[in-house]
Amino acid sequence: MKRTKNINQETFRKSWRSYRLAPVALAVSAVFMLAGCEKTDETVSLYQNADDCSQANPSQSAECTTAYNTALQEAVKTAPKYATREDCVAEFGESQCTQAPAQAGMVPTSSSETTAAAPQQSGSMWMPLMAGYMMGRMMGGGASQPLFTSKAPNSPANGKFVDASGKNFGAATTGRTMTVPKTALAPKPAVTKTITRGGFGESVAKQSSMQRSAATSSKTTTRSMGG
């Protein structure tokens, strides 16, 4: 009888510990569920210029202009740089390149307002013209990022909107709205060194491959969870 009593006491202690831990486990699960529900994406619109944005959003004309000018300034700092015009044209096509400003305060105009006919100067760098910009719809302060496109037939960025890191945002069509990670609107590092011909195209191809893999992985996870 004494042995049976000890066994019952041990069983009771295990049950009591399980009861005490249950609320803790539920609380931890709730924290992870809430973290998973936090918004990690941002709805953005893609435009070629401030006029396109203003026409689509008449009441936000000032915000459109601010976002456009911010993107132009970012383009100067973050666009890929080339040692020669030929290297830039090889990646982005004719009429898609301009000399990078020598002074930080200088901002190039968009591809619709600038030609690539400027003579090359000693020590200058070349960069693609900003072809459009991404504007966060719900974020204040004109949050935006410059977008580039290529007209070179063999470029993976041909006809696409890509950012300074080479990430692909689909067809270079103005007025599109899409959902992107919030990191897409985060500032990119300044580019002060030139890259070799074809280097940016390789970045675009690599980023596109990573995006496809991530999309496939997301679909697989959703199916496995019964989504």
Curated annotation (Swiss-Prot):
Composition bias, Low complexity: 212-227
Region of interest (Disordered), residue spans: 198-227
InterPro entries referenced in this protein's UniProt entry, alphabetically: Biofilm_formation_YgiB
Protein name as it appears in the record: UPF0441 protein YPO0661/y3517/YP_2976
UniProt record similarity statement: Belongs to the UPF0441 family.
HAMAP family the UniProt entry points to: UPF0441
Superkingdom to which the source organism belongs: Bacteria
Pfam annotation, one family: DUF1190
